[in-house]
Amino acid sequence: WIMGHMVNNIKQIDEFVNLGSNAIETDVSFDKKANPEYTYHGTPCDCGRDCLRWEYFNDFVKALRTATTPGNSKYDKLFLVVFDLKTSSLYDYQASEAGTKLAKNLLQHYWNNGNNGGRAYIILSIPNLKHYKLITGFQQTLKDEGHAELLDKVGYDFSGNDDIGDVQKTYEKAGVTGHVWQSDGITNCLLRSFTRINAAVANRDSANGIINKVYYWTVDKRQTTRDTLDANVDGIMTNYPDITVEILNEDAYKTKFRIATYEDNPWETFKE
C-alpha cells in the first residue's frame, strides 16, 4: 500500500493518486463538541510540505465518496483511507462522543446511509491509547444506525509510537480482535531507528499477535524506502508516491513486493 501523506485538500486526492498512491492519509481536527470539523494538519508538519491546506470535513468526505464510487476513474486506484484523528484537542472523556459523531458523519456523507456510498476501506488512526473508546463509540453507533455491515470496511491504528504490548492490551479493552494496522514513524525532517517497526512486524508474524499490517511514515528518500521494504512492511506513507513506485520496480523488490489492488483485503495478514 502506497499511502499518500497529508492529503487534506480535495485537489490533492487527484494529485496523489496520479503519482501512484492507492491509499491516502487525511488529518481530521475536531471542534470543542467533538465534531469532526476540518481536514487540516497545521504547523509544524513535514519538511517541504504546505501545512495549511484544508477543507471542511464534510466537503472532503463527499469528494472522497465521489472518487471511490464505481464509475469514477479513481475508483479502482484509491481504496484505503487513513483518517489521522487529531484527538489531542479533546478531553479524554470526549473520545466516545468523537467516535459517535465521526460514525454519523461518515454514514451520511461517505457511505450515503448505506446506499451506494464510497467503497474505500477506512482506518481510524488514534494518537492516544487513552482514547480507545472512540473505537467503541464508532462501532456502537453504526450498529445502532442499522449498518453494522459497514464495520467490515473499518480498521484501526494507534499512532502514538507506544509499546506494542500496551497497544495490544488497549485493543483487548476495546474488544478489537482484527482489522489492525500498526504505524511507526517520525516526520521526514528527522531519522528514526527501525527497532519498533521490527517489533510490530514480529507481532504481525507471530501466532498470538493482533497486528495484521504494518506501515512506516514518512518515507521520502530512496534509501529509506529500500530500508523500509527490507523491514517487510505492508505499507509506506510518503509525500512522494512516485519514488515508492520507482523503488518497487527495482530488481531487488519487483519480485518480492507488488502494489496492492482493490481485490487485496487490508485486514488479512499476508503469509509468505
Swiss-Prot record:
Cell compartments where the protein resides: Secreted
Q: Which residues bind Mg(2+)?
A: E25, D27, D84
What are the record's GO terms for cellular component? extracellular region
Q: Which cofactor does it need?
A: Mg(2+)
Cofactor binding notes: Binds 1 Mg(2+) ion per subunit.
Q: Does the keyword Heme apply?
A: no
Disulfides per UniProt: C45-C51, C47-C189
**What SUPFAM superfamilies does the annotation carry?**
PLC-like phosphodiesterases
Task: Describe, from its UniProt entry, the tissues in which this protein is expressed.
Answer: Expressed by the venom gland.
- Whether Electron transport counts among this entry's keywords is no
Record keywords: Cytolysis, Dermonecrotic toxin, Disulfide bond, Hemolysis, Lipid degradation, Lipid metabolism, Lyase, Magnesium, Metal-binding, Secreted, Toxin
One GO biological process term is: lipid catabolic process
Kindly give the InterPro entries that the UniProt entry links to this protein.
PLC-like_Pdiesterase_TIM-brl
Top-tier EC class? lyase
Give an example GO molecular function.
phosphoric diester hydrolase activity
Catalysed transformations (reactions): an N-(acyl)-sphingosylphosphocholine = an N-(acyl)-sphingosyl-1,3-cyclic phosphate + choline; an N-(acyl)-sphingosylphosphoethanolamine = an N-(acyl)-sphingosyl-1,3-cyclic phosphate + ethanolamine; a 1-acyl-sn-glycero-3-phosphocholine = a 1-acyl-sn-glycero-2,3-cyclic phosphate + choline; a 1-acyl-sn-glycero-3-phosphoethanolamine = a 1-acyl-sn-glycero-2,3-cyclic phosphate + ethanolamine
Active site as annotated:
H5, H41 (nucleophile)
Question: EC no.?
Answer: 4.6.1.-
Give the family this protein belongs to, as stated in its UniProt record: Belongs to the arthropod phospholipase D family. Class II subfamily.
Summary of the function given for this chain in its UniProt record:
Dermonecrotic toxins cleave the phosphodiester linkage between the phosphate and headgroup of certain phospholipids (sphingolipid and lysolipid substrates), forming an alcohol (often choline) and a cyclic phosphate. This toxin acts on sphingomyelin (SM). It may also act on ceramide phosphoethanolamine (CPE), lysophosphatidylcholine (LPC) and lysophosphatidylethanolamine (LPE), but not on lysophosphatidylserine (LPS), and lysophosphatidylglycerol (LPG). It acts by transphosphatidylation, releasing exclusively cyclic phosphate products as second products.
Q: What is this protein called?
A: Dermonecrotic toxin LvSicTox-alphaIC1biii
* Organism annotation: Loxosceles variegata (Recluse spider)
